[in-house]
Amino acid sequence: WHTGSNKNIAMSILYRPQKDAKNLDGLTIKIAEILKQAMQENYNIKLTIKEPNDLMLNKKKICGILTESNTIGNKINYVIISIGFNVNEKEFPKELENIATSLYKETGKEFDKEKIIKILIKSLENII
């Protein structure tokens, strides 16, 4: 994954939900669905999901999602959700030009990263 200085979102969120481990089933896809819906509702941007963990825009990768979890018995100890989202990237390395994109490259506009982060976090509040 590639990110320019202060242009994109690269974040990890730690949850300690104290819930049953069965809530982890299909978690990455659930997160992708929620992020896809949030971008549609807030920006009218239609992303697609490429399993197992990517969001695509115009057949190019714009976002990647990774999850890591730890359980104790049948209870969730913690979940880490990591999201890399290409927001205001204007140029990609040559090897990524045909497979990666950003909101800026697709729309020609700069986006407020902090606003997007708030939307993503709010959207994920009840994920587990």
What are these regions (language model features)?
Residues 19-47, 57-128:
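Long, positively charged amphipathic alpha-helical accessory segments at protein N-termini or as interdomain linkers
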